[in-house]
Amino acid sequence: MTPFLAALIALPILAQAPTGSLDRLPDPRTMPAAKLQVSLPKVQSFTLSNGLRVLFIEDHDLPAVTLSAAFKAGSLEDPSGKAGLASMTATLLRSGGTKRLTASQLDETLEGLAADVEFGADTEQSGGYVHCFKKDAPQVLGLFAEMLREPRFAQDRVAFVRNQTLSGLKQMEDQPIQVALRGLRRMVFNDKGQGHVATPESVKAITEQDLRAFAKTWFVPNNMVIGLSGDLSLSEAKALLKKAFGDWPKASLPAQARSSEPTKAEPGLYLQAKAGLNQSVVLGGMQGMRDTDPDRVALGAAFLVLGEGGFGNRLFNTIRTQHGLAYAAGSATAFRNTVDGAFFSYALTKGESTVKALGLMREECQKLAAKGITPEEWENAKRTLLNQEVFAGATSRDVVGTAVQHTLFGQPLDTRAKRLEKLQGLSLEQVNEAVRRRFHPEQLRFYVLGDPAGFGEAKLESLGKVTPVKG
């Protein structure tokens, strides 16, 4: 019987049921909830003699092995004038071949083993990923180690990745949301830190020597954390990694001059005019907090209510649902580990709605700072965050990946459990007190990308001084 048919049959039965018995049922919204207990796989740890740290979970569900590797070096280590170096280096580790194997030979070998190997770089870190059958793990991890230790950086592959990167930057110019986000990033962060973004000029300036130097400096065992899970015992895991990485010598690491200096751009309203653009991108942004901040959990809940909680958030309800002004509206928060993170709000709207959408965005931010969130919003946010914690540990790969991040940035392995405990013990009053103390909308930089000729009768200047920027 299909669920639909079962529902049809049940309808007359429900209709004849006495309503008094239903009236006596407790309201699920007021029922006390049991404290959430999350059971996670056991993470075991060990360190090789060269300083390479390993987190391991034994998982015999499938005859496979999954490895994630993280290095504490990302785009924040890009030299001045060469933004994009970390990303290009990581890409070429996989696509550029090794000293022993050309790119084509490496591809053919991995395809023959049905192995997946990837590399990438983010703001604070670079990393790699491996997934393969257990029987092939010694060979695949040997190849992975070879890519890290002896990358080829052949001229033709460097040229290919450079052109690919330049093509991506050119395509971004046709994506208003990407153009606006890049502009806002420069308003929120100084050009020595997260505001140091790749440009065609910086990508063209990157040399083969730069790529080799970045890899040699940062991709070393004592700057590396590995997360390993799969059909292995602890002794097998140790032997496997010792064979692949054990003779890789440690290296001296330079100091990381990471910057969280405030931007020179004052809080206010910035306009990047683009003639002929029918739609506007409206953004608000400010520096945020680090992952270890004591108020992270409380403010995370408040920001979920403001703009991150799906279709039920305030920005979406006000700007899109109630006023019908935007195709999308909300906010996002990035918590960083070694530098300050970011908060930003957004609305994608038609030209004539630009000024009103921006005004409503600002009002909702001010309302949150002044009044906090309601009891109902707090309960919904808390439930959502607890559910996220449950599903964040759905697989061994998820759990060991979280452990890698905590270890890489010097946090205890029980950080996630402590955060969950703190969430369950938080009160609405504590959340709103943190909001009043830490969230200051007057520090927001609002950034509009659009055509002023299409804004209609409403003037952007009605919201305050407007500073034109080129993006």
Segments the model singles out, each with a brief description of its role:
Residues 17-26, 101, 105-214, 260, ...:
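Acidic/histidine-enriched segments that form metal/cofactor-coordinating
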Residues 66-131, 174, 193-197, 310-325, ...:
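M16/MPP (pitrilysin/insulinase) zinc-metallopeptidase core fold and M16-derived inactive scaffolds
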Residues 182, 208-244, 442-445:
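Non-catalytic, conformational "gating/processing" segments within enzyme and secreted inhibitor domains
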Residues 75, 283-287, 307-349:
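A structural supersecondary motif
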Residues 20-44, 168, 185-224, 252, ...:
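Histidine-acidic residue clusters that define the catalytic metal-binding segment
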Residues 164-183, 260-279, 317-326, 371-426, ...:
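Short acidic/His-enriched helical or mixed secondary-structure segments at domain edges of catalytic enzymes
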Residues 19-24, 29-31, 225-290, 393, ...:
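An aromatic/glycine/proline-enriched structural segment found at the starts
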Residues 95-101, 131-162, 309-310, 334-392, ...:
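M16/insulysin-pitrilysin zinc metalloprotease superfamily fold
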